[in-house]
Amino acid sequence: MLADRVLVYFEDARRFYEEALKEFEEGVRRGDPYKVRDAAEKAWNAVVQATNALLLKLAGKLPSSHWERRRMLRELEAKMPEVRALMLRDRYGVREGHLHEMVFYEGVVDVEDIRYELGKVRAYLDDVGKLLGVGT
């Protein structure tokens, strides 16, 4: 069932976000930059999974790449004013740049910036949850 798969992806997003928060706090407490970087990657994956849920529900298809997610979000924004108003495509790209590329791959560990980004991930999940009709 499509609806079940949508919920599985969104639940994965929530779980990855919760794990990211735990791992981030543990990494900060221990002074472990690798834990913090892993937390950023989990937070990024929360965005990816939430986006998968949204695209599966609204477009009826799962994207096969980050590029395809951005394209599908752009197409949804063109068709749906409520999606366009949330600027999800832009937000998706920014989280990718900050969490996935800068923190995880490049190793830029600015604790306060990452904490700020984690809040942005939460807001993204909240907005996607509203579009899906599920709470976060």
Where are these regions (language model features)?
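Short linear functional motifs in flexible/disordered or boundary regions
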Residues: 25, 32, 51, 58-59, ...
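Charged alpha-helical initiation segments
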Residues: 1-34
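Non-transmembrane, amphipathic alpha-helical segments
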Residues: 5, 31, 35-39, 106-109, ...
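Long, charged low-complexity segments
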Residues: 55-136
